[in-house]
Amino acid sequence: MEKSKDISFYRRSEPSKGINFLSDISKQLLLDCLQSNTANPFFELIDNYKTQADLSFCGLSNLVITLNALKVDPKTKWKGIWRWYSEENIMCNNIEKVKDYGMTLSEFGALLNCNGVKNKIYRPVNENFALNTVIDMNNINKTLYDDIKENKYSCVTCDEHFNSMIPFNIVSKEFMSACALASAKYNTFFMMCNLGRKGLNQTGDGHFTPIAAYNAKKDIGLLLESARFKYDSRWYSIEDIYNSLIEKDSFTNKPRGFLLIEKKEKEGKKLKWMKR
């Protein structure tokens, strides 16, 4: 036991899938995206990107990155006279719970809502899923709804906030459209993935990562990596990313998925989401 305490690692070897963000090929891929206007989230995200502050903080740190990239005012002091988001001052967040259990996709969406950012959840389904299937409001996310009723997410108590976390089912072709939409729309519209690392030939379980650019010619997306002590940011095929979203979250027993996130320019303005 004494010996095991001395074991340490400096990063993992590169996974067999994907293209390293720092490679020459990556530079050309990003240049193509910039020229075709499909890397709009890139600069806002990379300007605020950082290594996650704890091993289980991929969700929380990416939440902080997202809020700061969207230029949301936290309305609370960070240090000195400055207001800024950090892992310690996210409204309604239980940081000790996140250290122990991490964060689910629904919790990520709930915390975005608590901090004034509109979002919608999409989960992958079998290709044969009927797109007109009626979603049962009584059964979806029951665990999260119970938490809300018990006031565990203190300000997420109204139906409006909960309804925005009801997931829309999506198939792979629609996922490709979502990637194109999120990368080309504008720099206040992000796509955050909650994927299973195994689908990308990486070690570990669930992970949060935004798609910062989408190369339509090669049909690949750039995933930014908050666990920089472990892996570099990489480009992956849209097929591989989608398949990694199908993996079930061991905590919720539901497929993982992604969020489309948009900053509201004006209070009450209706947001246009991906059409069904």
Tell where the protein language model's regions lie, with residue ranges.
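Noncatalytic regulatory segments and standalone regulatory/sensor domains
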Residues: N215-R276
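Active-site-adjacent substructure of cysteine-protease-like catalytic cores
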Residues: E127-E225
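Cysteine-nucleophile protease catalytic domains, especially the papain-like/related folds used
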Residues: P15-D146, C155-I166, S250-E265, K270-R276
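Long, acidic, intrinsically disordered low-complexity segments
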Residues: M1-S23
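A short linear-motif detector with a strong N-terminal bias
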Residues: S36-T38, E44-I46, V98-K99, F168-K173, ...
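Generic cytosolic/nucleocytoplasmic N-terminal low-complexity/intrinsically disordered segments
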Residues: E2-S4, E150-N151, N253
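Generic hydrophobic secondary-structure signal
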Residues: C58-L70, F108, C179, K185, ...
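A generic "cationic amphipathic patch" detector
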Residues: K71, K79, G206, L223-L224, ...
